[in-house]
Amino acid sequence: MAAQRELYDAIVIGAGIQGCFTAYHLAKHSKKVLLLEQFFLPHSRGSSHGQSRIIRRAYPEDFYTQMMAECYSLWAQLEHEAGTQLYRQTGLLLLGMKENPELKIIQATLSRQGVEHQCLSSEELKQRFPNIRLARGEVGLLEVSGGVLYADKALRALQDAIRQLGGIVHDGEKVVEIKSGLPVMVKTTSRSYQAKSLIITAGPWTNRLLRPLGAELPLQTLRINVCYWQEKVPGSYSVSQAFPCFMGLGLSLAPHHIYGLPSREYPGLMKVCYHHGNNADPEERDCPAAFSDIQDVHILSGFVRDHLPDLQPEPAVMEHCMYTNTPDGHFVLDRHPKYDNIVIGAGFSGHGFKLSPVVGKILYELSMKLTPSYDLTPFRISRFPSLGKAHL
């Protein structure tokens, strides 16, 4: 078949936000690129669906805050190219106890990196945001440039751009076999392809593709409950009322972050979620028998009742999303330990969407054997000492 003889510069497996930005950078640099997606687009099986994500520079680590500087400009560039709004500035409010160490570290990082922010006392918070109820000793850190990314619009814009730049997008094609070598061979349910390099951005399916290639990453796949809460007075927590996105840090009732953003999906509802979930195989994420524990919803109900009194304290809508977590919460951006023309982008741990413009650029650079634009030490596979040679 002609398709088998055709040689691509790169094949990208997985058309979530990371794979789309990787293919976009490849196509922008005039590379012959094929983007493969096992499901028909758009779909809600992975980690990139839905209408909204938080964008922020507020991180404890300098390297993420530095990467975000370029991400903001690349998001703006995509907005301009697509002729549609992909980002809305709302501000990001971090809530925590005054002595919370993570809050202090984030504030220090923002100061060091020259990111505009404001430290708000309990009194100032009450004046600025009267519909947030605070516990005694809670303070706020407002990152001015934080806001909302329109996730579904971003995916569509990228897929359109890839095609316009000459890239090829094939959905409804599941990869069934990868043969390492030069060229690398990729067999799907429809046909076979070959390429000089392969980039795997397969989210919770990553290890299914890596195991036959002699590698396995320490990835934990979680099903997240995405909860929407009804406003008692419509509009009280809306963008039009200048209500920000928020993150609750170090809360006594919640071992993990709680985050929220003004809802665009459902008018009159606000998205408030817990940054953790239950272990789940991505193939079985919709099986109710697998998920008896909805402790996170109880945690969220308590938070809403205590902090957001103008919301009903029970979720009105609950949807699902997948996280693919690493032990340290940092990404994997690296070449396969044995095959240097196979590149892996994985383990985005529930905070990768906003960083995808730079992640895609890095994966493009790795696949083309270019010097990466950023120090990849935090993202190397070798940081996992438990991965002995037997795994690789």
Curated annotation (Swiss-Prot):
EC numbers for this chain: 1.5.3.1, 1.5.3.7
Pfam families cross-referenced by the UniProt entry: DAO
MF terms (GO), sorted A to Z: flavin adenine dinucleotide binding; L-pipecolate oxidase activity; sarcosine oxidase activity
In-chain residues carrying the UniProt-annotated modification N6-acetyllysine: K126
Gene Ontology biological-process annotations: L-lysine catabolic process to acetyl-CoA via L-pipecolate
Motif (Microbody targeting signal): 390-392
Function: Metabolizes sarcosine, L-pipecolic acid and L-proline.
Protein's recorded name: Peroxisomal sarcosine oxidase
The organism of origin for this protein: Bos taurus (Bovine)
